[in-house]
């Protein structure tokens, strides 16, 4: 999620004028028509593709009656009439830029009391105008199947991002904001929300070097723009290994007890002396699981986890640009610069948190890896060891899959396999189960809606309206969940349009979707897109189903956690609505949802066999989960290693020796120091995509995981369907978006006042209370 540095605001909205009400009534009539033609169950629209295509007007064999009943209007992406083509996207960007400029001119020249009172509100409207282009383009360039749309999105994103960075260093805007906040006659009439947002904006201006000389501000703009471009290039290439294949001598593989069936599928080089194992597809991974030759496994693993030299250079350039920007802002490191305003306020507290967690986990991790060490020692004819350091020294990352498989061959389990389990979890079952869960704990449900022609970027996209039992429609989720060529491989939650209050002076709603508050005022509906890459399987002629592994169920719950934050975090001002909050707080609602996804009571309610309708047995789930959770601490430690790598790439040593800093050397040295599953062979750091989006804040996943664990045990362990505790979580945390201090939110949810102020003691408390 891209966060706009500046521009956040809001104000008390009043009931619209009569002429404006008429326009809104026309809008809601259209929305009502969509609602009337909503299909039946959620399960059916995700599990029966022919039904979906039929009711959505995509089936050429539709009956005349069906075509009449489901007649569709024509529109653009997300019901924005501009977005029917790449040129339309460019036009929308230009129109938005013009609107932003007009609003800017008004703000700079309105010195009346009214102008001062609405200044923060107008900053937020300005931000919304820019973000509705920037966030939209962020989504399109990651997901849209049309290359022309992707190119247009990149162009528009660059243009708007540069304009935004210019505004972030605009001295006149900052000075007016300071005068508003420092004038008691004005500030006393502002809402608490406006004052909070105004202070955040002022901090963000200062973070952009607003008080520095013009040359420095111009340099800040250039660096920010370059970081954005280099970062996008970096993220676009993280899926690609360094080479398409790796050569393995035939004699090494032929004598490694590998399946002859597998070997026959491999090509050889011209001389016939080497197998050419592709670094894509299943073959290399199958060899990692079955090849007894460690040197072969090592070579394969290294190739699978490496990237090109060009990608390493992109990462190095990104890291150095960030260090230069931080230095320009008089900070010792990019981590210090980035952590301002976060829950963890400085790099030392972050590193202490990670180290505490590592120290609490390393013995458990070594104990989990002990079975691999024993099997490997036996193969190498070495004496067995129980010493932690010796275990960790012996077990390497290319051993994990091979010896895990060998262990289960020697110790066969009666647990069901992943395929058996997945037959109970069709995509439709899981989405329906999520809706039922949200209905019980939050009083909201997911309701399918037919899309207009042109509203989505693929015929496989489903629209879900989010319906509150008290307020009606409160948001929209576009679900792009099925596998598609060229689509991002990483699951993601994209904010397309934030929620915010709509003000009396606003009359044009052609490019947004609008909701109504219980008091009769109006708000911009939050619009988000959930993107996954689930693979349907053909089960009969012309019928396919998408069966989810439990890990994929967890992924979907995680992304829906973000979605609920976006829907329920409805503030007056868009820049603090939903997931527009501190980076080390934003993962908390989504990680909490992972606990629900692992709960047997939830899973037995969702899991229904696709053929018989039989409910999955709790014992079946428990046996399977026990067989797959045996390396939990190892996974936690691996996440901690990545968090420490992120800190290492953004600490003070970069700027002090910038010409000689080597990202791969730094990565491998850290791996050796941290001991667990040491990788001192690959340049995997060049494939760590989160280094761009979560630069200096990747610790957020672990940090929020420890907090989510405490919240789960406090609120939902006894009853995951508790409406009382669901309301408590919604009231004290979700509804605030980024307005309320995150530490205060957590303290209120846990009824733990000592956490309210945050700081080192609170960080230490969270780290020590980690439960794996």
From Swiss-Prot:
The keyword Cell division does not apply. GO terms for cellular component: mitochondrial matrix; mitochondrion. Binds 1 zinc ion. Changing residue 558 to R: Abolishes proteolytic activity. InterPro entries: M3A_MIP, MetalloPept_cat_dom_sf, Neurolysin/TOP_dom2, Pept_M3A_M3B, Pept_M3A_M3B_dom. Its cofactor is Zn(2+). GO terms for molecular function: metal ion binding; metalloendopeptidase activity. CDD domains: M3A_MIP. It is found in: Mitochondrion matrix. GO terms for biological process: intracellular iron ion homeostasis; peptide metabolic process; protein processing involved in protein targeting to mitochondrion; protein stabilization. Present with 2690 molecules/cell in log phase SD medium. PANTHER family: MITOCHONDRIAL INTERMEDIATE PEPTIDASE (PTHR11804:SF79), PROTEASE M3 THIMET OLIGOPEPTIDASE-RELATED (PTHR11804). Belongs to the peptidase M3 family. This is Mitochondrial intermediate peptidase. It comes from Saccharomyces cerevisiae (strain ATCC 204508 / S288c). The gene is OCT1.
